[in-house]
């Protein structure tokens, strides 16, 4: 019984082990086919790497401009609006907001070209508006860096032009408002002067009718329109001549308005150097390209070539076995 059991045990074979060994033997015998497949795959991969467009990404980080960068713009706004001028912090937020909007519009335009270009802008930190990360994907490292800097400058120039136009429009409107205010105050002052002369002339008429030639009162500060004739005709005639030649009397507001108008006239918007952003990090020169990845491509080529070669070998052997049966 013990011998028979040993024979039975010796005749038990593991089918999976036999199949694996047979599989490895088949692959070894067909190694030349596999090697050729790998070589062909590598050659195709090298060809792909030679013709594929490279992608390099240059990145920059920007934020709102410094106070010094918008000093001229802030001064112009203060001259135009006076006490109603926006705060510097509000101007900074407005400028970077306009830059971001203009940059996004440019990115959309580039993406819709016949040959799309990838330009992006997004917050550097999630859930925070600033700073902003801008990037450009080019076919060379130097080209990506140069293009990104060019597009940033292009957007900044565009925002600058828009701001200058807005300033010129606001200056024209502010100048008109100040000129209208001056004319109104001058008309009022002239009317007050004319009214004063008429009042004195009326008092002179009463004085003549009452034959009052000399002053009848001592305290002139107590004189009213009804008692002015008591100053006497001689004094009233002298007052009329004096009032006629005396310049118009204006309030301090009139002279402040003239000063504001002079300040606006002295504004030279064309000389303003306005920047809507500030670099936190200038456009980088990428050292690693995004695609194609040489190492990954070649590794995949070897794996794919090996799999195809193994498939050919196993398929060919399976076909031979089928025909032999």
From Swiss-Prot:
Topology feature Cytoplasmic, residues: 1-31, 316-325
Stretches assigned to the Periplasmic side: 53-294
GO function terms (MF aspect): protein tyrosine kinase activity
Swiss-Prot/TrEMBL GO biological process terms: lipopolysaccharide biosynthetic process
Subcellular location: Cell inner membrane
Record carries keyword Transmembrane helix: yes
Keywords, ordered alphabetically: Cell inner membrane, Cell membrane, Lipopolysaccharide biosynthesis, Membrane, Transmembrane, Transmembrane helix
Membrane-crossing residue ranges in chain numbering: 32-52, 295-315
Domain of life: Bacteria
Listed InterPro entries: Bact_polysacc_biosynth/exp (IPR050445), LPS_length_determ_N_term (IPR003856)
Membrane-topology annotation of the record: Multi-pass membrane protein
Pfam families noted in UniProt: Wzz (PF02706)
Gene Ontology cellular component annotations, sorted alphabetically: plasma membrane
Pathway given in the UniProt record: Bacterial outer membrane biogenesis; lipopolysaccharide biosynthesis
Role this protein plays: Confers a modal distribution of chain length on the O-antigen component of lipopolysaccharide (LPS). Gives rise to a reduced number of short chain molecules and increases in numbers of longer molecules, with a modal value of 13 (in strain O111/M92) and of 17 (in strain K12).
Family the entry assigns: Belongs to the WzzB/Cld/Rol family.
Record protein name field: Chain length determinant protein
Organism: Escherichia coli
